[in-house]
Structure formats: structure tokens, C-alpha cells
Amino acid sequence: MSDYKHTLNLPETEFPMRGDLAKREPNMLKRWYDQDLYGAIRRAKAGKPSFILHDGPPYANGSIHIGHSVNKILKDVIIKSKGLSGFDSPYVPGWDCHGLPIELKVEGMVGKPGEKVSAAEFRAECRKYAKTQIEAQKTDFIRLGVLGDWEHPYLTMDFGTEANIIRSMAKIVENGHLHKGSKPVHWCTDCGSALAEAEVEYYDKNSPSIDVRFKAVDEATVAAKFDCPEGHLGKGPISAVIWTTTPWTLPANRAIAMHADLDYALVQVEGEHPERLILAAELVKDVMDRAGIEKFHNLGYTKGVALELLRFNHPFYSFDVPVVLGDHVTLDAGTGAVHTAPGHGQEDFVVGQKYGLEVANPVGSNGVYLPDTELFAGQHVFKANAAVVEVLTERGALLHHMVFNHSYPHCWRHKTPIIFRATPQWFISMEQKGLRQRALEEIERIEKDGITQHGQSGWVPAWGKNRIQAMVENRPDWCISRQRTWGVPISLFVHKETQQLHPESVRLMHEVAKRVEQSGIQAWWDLDKAELLGSDADMYDKVPDTLDVWFDSGSTHSSVVDARPEFNGHSADLYLEGSDQHRGWFMSSLMIGVAMKDKAPYNQVLTHGFTVDGQGRKMSKSIGNVVSPQDVMNKLGADILRLWVASTDYTGEMTVSDEILKRSADAYRRIRNTARFLLANLNGFNPATDMVAAADMVVVDRWAVGRAKAAQAEIVTAFEEYNFHGVTQKLMQFCSIEMGSFYLDVIKDRQYTAKADSLARRSCQTALYHIAQAMVRWMAPIMSFTADEIWALLPGERSEFVFTEEWYDGLFGLDAGEQMDDAFWAEILTVRGEVNKALEAARGEKRIGGSLQAELTLFAKPELAERLNALADELRFVLLTSKAKVVTADTAPEGSVATERADLWLSVAQSAAAKCDRCWHHVEDVGTIAGHEEICGRCATNVEGDGETRQFA
């Protein structure tokens, strides 16, 4: 018996079945950096149209978490896909380096500035600490397979960037957007500093809920405002009742706010101690119920506007306050009368400005009442709530008191409740130069330009537009000053007496920036005023405040994008961050961009959701559901993490767990196995000498290349639309359905048994080569390590890295109108599906073993029969049976099996023919060929003759 194994073209490749990514990826990374892959990409893309994704800087503190990984991987997928689309798309990663979290870490190590160390030494320690954090994070980001200029990232603490931040501020001053004022701002008493909107988080908190009487100064005048029947003005003192959940703010009360258009009732409380209360008419019953007052009736009604400027006594101080009118007063809760402390609330401040009220702030930066605060000096405000209630009770001003659970603002860093506190601060005005209106116009422009240029809103997903629009419409002036040590100085000089800015502030800021560029922000604190101000130095103070860190990052479109040579003067095409950045980086960048240049700094904004566990819960160490990117990379490899990110719809919450990552690993294996089949069957193929022209190829091979062409069109469009889960779905469908369950199955016989250098086999290899060339590029932005591995094993001449390439342009398909066009093969696929079901049933009945034991008869109506017969004897190769006979039939013949097609019936029988030892087909001529008794005539031709001819499959 002869051994024909050596005559077969068995698949062979160095591409292993197991990816073993966790072990092998680090070696690939080393090669990328040893061979300067990022530089190679830049050189290959030089002169191409630019696409700039500007990196929103993560904060330089702590290890990266799964959310960081999602963000960086999404950016990397876009950058790499843009390179493949023919763009020069440099990626400069950055870090946010100033601010409170680093200060707190350094305080824990060296103490507070001015105590054990000087402020200058403290800043130096902050700079040193930030550097160590950046290096640790950078290592993890690189391990993710993210390509960028990691050797030259931008840091907001780079001297040049610090200087450019000051220059950005100077431009805003020049454009007239800056003003100083005493306004209530979010204030953390633990930080001792103002907080930005984005640094505020909301948690449930128990607070005292109190209803408080403010007695009328002139009861007769007040009563006369109500339409009470003559002689029925009631009896007892008259009080307006306010409701508040912040009793500690009552020392700063300067008014009672009512709504001009609401109906107010004068309510007679009956009983032993009668009194008259002013309440919103719709809320009378609610207030009486919670106060436990059963006997009462309404004496009369009036509109809020009638009560404007009437005076009421403060409940425990010896002054009176007016009624003011404000649209912020609602009937959602309370009494319809709002306690107004302009120093402790944004709406209170606005209405206070309208009426010229004092902006009282009796609270120090540490949350303790100032020494001159009557009754409460030296008490912390949150502890003083009980003391305020006690005083109100003693004075007979407390109508009702209970504990109330509600959502309350907390410091993002300390997780402790914060306060609104009026302090002298520097603000970027939303109104004085029309910043709010222009920002809203830019939000609209981004949406419309996106639709015009890309067919979809510039806000991705589209709801992002409404979100940031509402925030801009309602946001207060931006408080940009902070009372911190580690930050970029505001770099202003103010007149000691008038508190006015120096008339040459813009020029002076540019002078300061020059010095900061040389030696960093410490240059400001080391600066002798006289050096810049000359003889005027004694008349001016240096402003000690630093800039809000959101100004640092929000100005990077100017301090970094405008300054870096690789961006070549282009503005950013895309900003991409988590959904919390509508009020964070997207907002600060928009405000600064419009304030500086009258234009948003981005053309598109993409938002991704937060990561949650398999049950939809936030990641939490206490719950034990944290998925660490480092663990995933060390166990499964970065490509699995990257595939999970790309496969997940980022527009909502992104669910991740060990089970979900296992599913990603399974999907990865299917893709890898397809790639392995392609490479293994390209063994011995030299595209320079063995490539077959499209016109000479076997029809099914051209069909397969055409499927790759169609898939590529969908995949490239999905990449352009940032629809990455659409990319992975199409890739999986292509590998599993079009290739795995049909084409790769069909070609095995021809690939393994045909003559090695025959047209039949080279046609197949030509198709596999084109498909591999295309598919490796589809994979490259997502499974970058695996794509690099495949690229290195492709036959023929090629560049060093797939990442310097563009989408493969060597694909072609079947011509429309050909007899065997795409529609023909689509129908063949449905027929094959029915055949597979019939073969499976026969296997289940033990009538056949493998499909090659089957002889198949297809009873088909004339039209289908004609199409099936077009494949002639090659139909059996398509259906993977040893024999396939087509019989024309109008109805189901006896003994046939019906299919889901109305024009097809099937009959499966076991072949009586002998099995060929080489191709395993059961063929009548086995045993009839002299010298080759164990094989069929077709195999004998392939072994010793000219080789078989294939036209169709």
C-alpha cells in the first residue's frame, strides 16, 4: 500500500493556534520600540491630509483603571484606522499635572507648604511626585498597544506648557471676558478651596428640614395686601414662612424670595396661640400637615408681586429683610417662600444682585463661622445646624423641624459635603462679552458641520449635543481662581487701593510667561514686582491665586495643539472622553476656545460610557468587582481587552466581567483560527510569481475575494462612523459565516489535493492572499499585536509594519450579470444549508458517517436545476459530497426529503463506491488505475499527470 501523504499540500505555518498573548505581546512591543514603529508611521504618512485626535489628559495620580483603558484603546483604534484611511494622524498623549489630588498626596509625605517645607520646596516635590505617577501610567498605556509619541508627551507642568497656559489666560483678559467678584462658589472646607463644577459629586445626605417664621415688621400693611373680607383680617402675629435644609445659612439671610405670579394665602392658625402665616396657596395643606396644625383657614389671597419689598424681621438678628421676587421659586417643595442668602447660593446671589442685597459671608475657608458671627462664632457650619435650630426654637421662630434625606453636593476628592460660599474670586463671564451665546452657536455649528461632512452629528452619540447645550445654558460664570500652591499662577497685578487690574496686564502676563518658560511656575513667586512694574511696584499686589486645573487642560488646544510642530497649525478634529466630560474637559475647552478664538477647539466630540460589572454595578473595591486592566493583560493579553472594548457599544454603559472577557477570548480564537488557515494555506505561495489574474481564477475564488471587498466597504465605513462594534460584528461574520462555514470548507479538497503549482491551487492561494492582505488591515486598529504577527508571516514583499499601510486596494469581485454572480452564489449557499441539514439527519440515523460517504440527489424545479447544473461535476465539491446529481422535478419525488425551499427536495444515500486513500472521496474508479490502485483517477492526475482542471469550485 502506497503512502500518498507526501503528495498532499498540507497546511504549514509558524503562526501558532494559541495566541499566548500575555507572554508574546511584550516581545512585540520591544520590537516596535526598538525599530521606532511610531516614527515609521509618521514618515510613511508625511504629507497626507491631517487628522488630529487631541488627547484629553488623564490626571497624573494613581494606577490606570479599566475606564482609562477603554479611553486610550478607543483613541488608538481611531488613530490607526485613520492612518489606514490615508491620513497623517499623530497622537501626542498628555497628562494633567497640577491641582489638589497631588497636593494632598505630597502633604501626606512632606507636610503642608509653609510648615515643614517652603512653598517652593512643596512645588518641587509635587513636580517630582507627578513624574513618578506619569511613568507608571505610561508603562501601562504602552502595554495596551497604544501607539503615540510616548517619548515626548505633553505635560501641563512642562515649563513651556505652563507658559502657554498663562498666554491663553492673557488672551482671555485681552478679549474682555475676565472679571473679579465676590460670588458664591462650590467650596470644600477640607480642601480650603473653590471647586470646579466637574469636581462636584452628588450623594444622599441627611439634613435638617425646617420651616421658619419671619415676623412682619408692619402687620397692618402686610394684611392689607390680601383680599380678606372687610373686618376679617384675622388675629395674631403675621409671619412669612420659609423652608430650608441648610439652617447654617440663616445668619447670612438677607431676603425672602417669592414668585411674582404665584398665589399666596394669609392663613389663620386657630387655637390658644393664634397666628397668621403667609404661604403659597397650593402648599398650605402640606405645610399644615407636617407642622401638625389641624385648625386653620385661609383669610385671603394675593399674588406674590403685591408683597414685593415688604419687610420682615430676621428670626434671630436685630434687622429686617425684604421680600424679593425670583423665577427660581417653585411649588415643588417647601412653602413658596425661599430663604435667600446671596453669599451661599447661586440663585440667591443672582436675585440679590438685582435688588442690591448684601453678599454676606460669615463663614471662613475652613467652614467655621468667623469670630464676629453673632451667636455662632467658632462653630463649624455643619455642626452648627443643631445650634441654629435651638436658637430658632428659643425665639419662637421654628414652625417645624424634621430630618430630610436628599441628594447633596460633595467634594470629589474628600467625599465630604461642600458648601456654597461667597469669596473674592476671578471669573470668566458668561455674559459680558456674549460668551454663552457664542458657545451655544458653536455647539449648533458642530452638529451641522458633522452632518454635512460625515453624515452624522458632530456630537457622537447625538444626545451629547443636548447635554452640553443644557449645561452651557444654565451654567454660572466660571470661577477660575483657586487658593492653592501647586498650580499655574493667574499672573495678575491688582492696585492695592482700587483693586483694579494693572492697565498693561496683557503685556505683563506675556512677560511672566517668558520667565515661566525658562524656569517653571516658581518664577512667578520668585518674581520681584519691581522687575516688571518699576516705580509702580509699591502700588500693586501680585495675585496669589492659581488657575483652576480645568483651565490647564481646557487650554491645551492652544498651549499644546497650536504649539506642537507635528500638528502643523491644524486644530483638533476630534475630542474623545467619558460622558462625565461634558461638564469637564469638553466644557472648559469650549469656553476657553470661544473666549480666545471665537471658535470651539474641536470639530467632533465622541463620548463613551462608564464601565460597570456584569450586573450593571459600578466598579468598587469594597464590592470586589473591579476588573483590573493589568490583570487582564497578564492573563489574556492586551488584544483580548482591545477586542472587548471594540465589540462593546460605547454609547452606553460598558459591561465587563471575567465571563464577558472569556467570550471576547472565544471570539478572538475564531478570528485567529481563520487567519491561521489563510497563512497555513499560503505555504509555498510567492505572489510575485504565483499570482493568478482575476480573469483566470476559479469562479468561487473570485466570489470569495468579492465578499472580502464587500466586507471591507462595510468595515471602512464603520470605522469612519466610529461604529467599532459594527466592525467586529462584520469581521466575525466574515470569518465564521462567509469564510469558515463555506469558502474555507469548500477549498480544502482543492487546496490539499490539487497539483502544487496547478492553476486550480494557485487560484485558491491567490484568493487567500488577497483576503489575508485585506483582513490583516481590518484587524490592525483593534487586535494590533495579532495583526502585526500575521503581517510578519504573509508571503511576498511588504513594508515592515502593517500600521504604515492603507486599506488594501487589490480586491475585486464577480461582475454583475455574469452567470455565476453574487446572487448565484447566495442561492448556492441556501441550497448548501438545506443539504447540510439533510446530511446531518442521515448521520443521526447512522446511514452515513462523514459527508463524503454520501451520494446526494437534488430534485429541483427547472429554474433551480438549471442553475445547479451550471456547476456540472463541481457541484459535489461545493456540497462536500462524493456525488451530487441534479434531477429536474416539479413535485416531491417518492422517498425524497422536503426542504425549506419550495423548489428543492433531497435524497441522501450511502455511496457503494470505494474510498480514495488520498482525497477520501468515494469514487467508482478507485482500484482501476494501474500503479495507483488505492486512489481515484482525479488524484492520479494530480499526482502524476498535468493536474485536474477546475472552473467553478
From Swiss-Prot:
Substrates-to-products reaction catalysed: tRNA(Ile) + L-isoleucine + ATP = L-isoleucyl-tRNA(Ile) + AMP + diphosphate
Entries under CDD domains matching the protein: Anticodon_Ia_Ile_BEm (cd07960), IleRS_core (cd00818)
Aminoacyl-tRNA synthetase is among the record's keywords: yes
Positions bound to Zn(2+): C916, C919, C936, C939
Residue span of motif 'KMSKS' region: 618-622
Coiled coil: none
Co-factor requirement: Zn(2+)
Chain span(s) of sequence motif 'HIGH' region: 58-68
Enzyme Commission numbers on file: 6.1.1.5
Any GO CC annotation of this UniProt entry: cytosol
Keywords: Aminoacyl-tRNA synthetase, ATP-binding, Cytoplasm, Ligase, Metal-binding, Nucleotide-binding, Protein biosynthesis, Zinc
Annotated L-isoleucyl-5'-AMP binding sites: E577
Annotated cofactor note: Binds 1 zinc ion per subunit.
Any one GO molecular-function label of the UniProt entry: tRNA binding
Listed HAMAP family: Ile_tRNA_synth_type1
Stated role: Catalyzes the attachment of isoleucine to tRNA(Ile). As IleRS can inadvertently accommodate and process structurally similar amino acids such as valine, to avoid such errors it has two additional distinct tRNA(Ile)-dependent editing activities. One activity is designated as 'pretransfer' editing and involves the hydrolysis of activated Val-AMP. The other activity is designated 'posttransfer' editing and involves deacylation of mischarged Val-tRNA(Ile).
Family: Belongs to the class-I aminoacyl-tRNA synthetase family. IleS type 1 subfamily.
Subunit structure: Monomer.
Domain statement: IleRS has two distinct active sites: one for aminoacylation and one for editing. The misactivated valine is translocated from the active site to the editing site, which sterically excludes the correctly activated isoleucine. The single editing site contains two valyl binding pockets, one specific for each substrate (Val-AMP or Val-tRNA(Ile)).
Record-given protein name: Isoleucine--tRNA ligase
Provenance organism: Aeromonas salmonicida (strain A449)
